[in-house]
Amino acid sequence: MKILIVASDKNGRFAPFIEEQMAALEARGMEVLRYGITGKGILGYLRELPALRRAIRQHRSDIIHAHYGLSGLLANLQRRVPVVTTYHGSDINVPSILRFSKIAMRLSAHNIFVSKRNVVIALGDEAMRLLGDKAKGTENGEADIQAFTPYTLHSTPTEAFTPKNTLLPCGVNIPLPWSEVQTQWVGQLTLNQWVHSKLDKEIKYVLFAGAFDNAVKDPELAKSVIVVYNSSFTNLQSPTANRQSPIANSQSLIANRQIELIELKGYTRDQVTALMYNCHALLMTSKTEGSPQVVKEAMACGCPIVSVDVGDVAERTSGVEGCYVVPTREPKDIAEALRKALAFNGRTNGRERIIAMGLSNEQVAKRLEEIYRMLV
């Protein structure tokens, strides 16, 4: 089976989680081709249509799998090949983009949503109709969709909540244990040597779930949490306060007494894995999310997690000791959860939870193949 992946192209590659999903599909014996979109905005995407049509004729694909709503809209402007579109959150949560995503939803042969909250936003009245007499309000006014459908990650696509829509978060690669990963080489250093050159054993490190220049991730809230934590839970001066930290000159680090916040930017995938294995916690303060990959990746590394209640984080981390979801955006409340996570002082059972939910890339690729075969 030939699958043509259509997604935004960044320097000749797709987003890492798309690349990893493609590799998992190839491991199942599928021929996976790519069409990278370099245009920006709706007009930039529409200008890609002639080239995309040529690629479709050339590749003779059985299925087109588009990632994000604008890519789905573009892919559906041809009607020769069935299109599966995955909506990742930003294409649902941003109203100006949602209107284009809704057109893609109507045209696509099958839609994949990565979180239940996105389902309610995207499908609106249809979602509530499908809830039927199980619909009930929650404290924040959103629909309770725990019983939205008999579909689970262990079900077949035909059990999805409609024949055209499936709830399926993206998967993650399950890394080898740190005892095996640490011997891999990064340039002139092993990962173990690299991480010890970056992290001081005397300091507790908190990995921020994004870049400091990404306003959607709300880095200012995260920095406020660090300030509150240090003023509330420690009166000790940081060991590095009067000497230079190994990464003190980096814009990617905020140092404040006993804990330091590290920006997740500019690292390779192996380096991110090393940080997740060695940092004391992951902190997420995003304003909106779908099914954030960084949370699932941290879980796979056993990293404790503190997050505001966003996307599907609460559902993913449910039952994972050392992980805390805060129902408010108050820095003091998040700082208290961070105190608990740091006091946990160990690795979580997140890896086992990821596998139990069927969220390894291998498991998700199997579900995708079932969807593809349902359409051809």
For the regions a protein language model found, what residue spans apply to each?
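A charged, aromatic-enriched C-terminal amphipathic alpha-helix characteristic of glycosyltransferases
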Residues: V181, R329, A343-M374
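Short alpha-helical donor nucleotide-sugar binding micro-motif in glycosyltransferases
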Residues: I56, M105, A274-C279
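A short, active-site helix/loop in glycosyltransferases that binds the activated sugar's phosphate group
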Residues: A109-K134, Y151-N165, V172
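Short hydrophobic beta-strand element within catalytic cores of glycosyltransferases
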Residues: P304-S307
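Aromatic "clamp/platform" in nucleotide-sugar-dependent glycosyltransferases that forms part
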Residues: K287
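Conserved acidic donor-binding segment of nucleotide-sugar-dependent glycosyltransferases
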Residues: G319-P331, R339-N345
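Conserved donor-binding/catalytic core segment of Leloir-type glycosyltransferases
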Residues: A160, L168-V172, Q184-K217, K223-N230
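Short His-centered aromatic/hydrophobic patch
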Residues: A66-S71
